[in-house]
Amino acid sequence: MMAKVESQTGDLNEKLIAVNRVAKVVKGGRIFSFTALTVVGDGNGRVGFGYGKAREVPAAIQKAMEKARRNIRDVQLKGNTLQHPIKGRHSGSKVYMQPASEGTGIIAGGAMRAVLEVVGVQNVLSKAYGSTNPINVVRATLDALENMNSPEQIAAKRGLSVNELLG
């Protein structure tokens, strides 16, 4: 079950990506519980995701939001797009994202779109390959965003100036 809910607390945008009912089979029958996948971000290069499980939907969402707020990471953006084309993978999911010109918008599907919206990317072209399981797509997207470097970071690693690096 895919759901999208947006809310704002303080300076963070929160998005609910997916709610899923899961069952534990026991001798007396099935015990149902719920899982929730959420992302939070400040729209300015900070993003985190959370995965919560509980017997009731609101409790699962609340747990996921708390985990997402504790799990915030920084991403180096270039204005409102990416620094350079990037690939990310997690488990069976692979994602490819590339910067886009002003006015393109977010061309991404499902879970990837939610992550890119809360991190503050406004122009991007992206594609998910392999498994489109929302949890793995979110993790692959965050993997790609974390591995993205600005020209300043790359120049510092190589011991060059930015002008020498860019030629």
From Swiss-Prot:
Gene3D superfamilies: 3.30.160.20, 3.30.230.10. The keyword RNA-binding applies. It comes from the Bacteria. One of its GO terms (biological process) is translation. Coiled coil: none annotated. The keyword Magnesium does not apply. Residues 12-75 form the S5 DRBM domain. GO terms for cellular component: small ribosomal subunit. InterPro entries: Ribosomal_Su5_D2-typ_SF, Ribosomal_uS5, Ribosomal_uS5_bac-type, Ribosomal_uS5_C, Ribosomal_uS5_N, Ribosomal_uS5_N_CS, Ribsml_uS5_D2-typ_fold_subgr. Keywords: Ribonucleoprotein, Ribosomal protein, RNA-binding, rRNA-binding. One of its GO terms (molecular function) is structural constituent of ribosome. PROSITE patterns: RIBOSOMAL_S5, S5_DSRBD. PANTHER family: MITOCHONDRIAL RIBOSOMAL PROTEIN S5. The N-terminal domain interacts with the head of the 30S subunit; the C-terminal domain interacts with the body and contacts protein S4. The interaction surface between S4 and S5 is involved in control of translational fidelity. Part of the 30S ribosomal subunit. Contacts proteins S4 and S8. Belongs to the universal ribosomal protein uS5 family. NCBIfam families: rpsE_bact. With S4 and S12 plays an important role in translational accuracy. Located at the back of the 30S subunit body where it stabilizes the conformation of the head with respect to the body. This is Small ribosomal subunit protein uS5. The lineage of its organism: Bacteria, Pseudomonadati, Pseudomonadota, Gammaproteobacteria, Alteromonadales.
